[in-house]
Amino acid sequence: MEGGGGERAAGVVRRLMAAKAESRKSFSEIGEEAGLTNVYVAQLLRRQAQLKPETAPALRAAVPGLTDDLVALMMEPPFRSYHPDIVHEPAIYRLNEAVMHFGESIKEIINEEFGDGIMSAIDFYCSVDKVQGADGKDRVVVTFDGKYLPYSEQRSDHMMSRLTRKTS
């Protein structure tokens, strides 16, 4: 079983991401071909989810660069990690857990789809919906809908405080 973090884990993730890059496919394209969500594909390739044996053939077909040893490592239970400084109220704890656990993959997909930037938490919509699952049990749906904000190049001639000082 793979230990928590460390050089070995980072090396495996680098190899998995290299196989993805070789495929020249986005997380979404791989997901469509493999019958998985794009976030789950990213989770698998970042070693934050365990590849199930029945899913391996479809993923290998979508990402031909996945070697036997990489697939074997992906089938081991991963060391899932996120920032440990969390709030202890159960609902907030679980929401933080979900955001922290999937955050790195979501960030990579945002960068892949939009470029270098972030989702606004100001021009932002969030909804919590109750739906009934296929098994008849209640399900919680949390939707984050935020405006994309690209990072700015920090040009001195665009910095108003400097422009104001020069004209004074």
From Swiss-Prot:
One of its GO terms (biological process) is cyanate catabolic process. InterPro entries: Cyanase (IPR008076), Cyanate_lyase_C (IPR003712), Cyanate_lyase_C_sf (IPR036581), Lambda_DNA-bd_dom_sf (IPR010982). Keywords: Lyase. It is an enzyme of class 4 (lyase). The active site is at residues 94, 97, 120. It catalyses: cyanate + hydrogencarbonate + 3 H(+) = NH4(+) + 2 CO2. It comes from the Eukaryota. Its EC number is 4.2.1.104. GO terms for molecular function: cyanate hydratase activity; DNA binding; identical protein binding. Belongs to the cyanase family. Catalyzes the reaction of cyanate with bicarbonate to produce ammonia and carbon dioxide. PANTHER family: CYANATE HYDRATASE. This is Cyanate hydratase.
